[in-house]
């Protein structure tokens, strides 16, 4: 069942990035954009800078696009708590769960958002015929979609008061929106030759065979606008 979006924060455009695609959007809304790497990497890293500018104690912010962002209050769980709900660990797990801020569980959504932005730019570039670098451009958003589902399971079980509150409503709306984006991007990029990788295929096979994990993601995604 669709839910109305929570109140969204506004992010002002701060540069005259040329174009009307996702790359121009994310680069144009950051005061210190990354522009010296590939377009995929630039979008990914610039998303982190926007999130950093939005972050404050106990609250994380994530850029959605078109000058809008969402601010989410941290639930009372740790990243280690979330890790216990992760059924299938991809190759990025250690970096973002073991070596990250344990007391900021929504930090992983900063990475999820960054992988979404990178994948969006990569898929748009593929569709427009741009020259593509060899990179697993869409596997990150797929891997983090499974971690986002684990986050939801964890918060629902470990902090039910948060899950039932307006803060929980906002988190569910955001997760649903991002899971839907991740699904569309992964499907769009799955058969792009430059994006293929053995690690991607292996992780997808393990995850898609686990119907319990798939059902959690589908239940969350069904809340999307």
Locate predicted features.
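Active-site recognition of the HExxH zinc-binding catalytic motif
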Residues: 39-57
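Post-HEXXH active-site segment of zinc metalloproteases
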Residues: 52-95
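Short, well-structured alpha-helical interface segments that form or flank functional binding sites
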Residues: 38-41, 106-116, 139-146
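Non-catalytic accessory regions used for complex assembly or targeting
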Residues: 1-22, 225
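Short pre-active-site segment immediately N-terminal to the catalytic Zn-binding motif
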Residues: 26-42
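Extracellular-facing segments of soluble proteins and assemblies that are Gly/Ser/Thr-biased and enriched
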Residues: 85-128
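Pan-zinc metallopeptidase signature
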Residues: 116, 120-225
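Short alpha-helical hairpin
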Residues: 16-24, 84-91
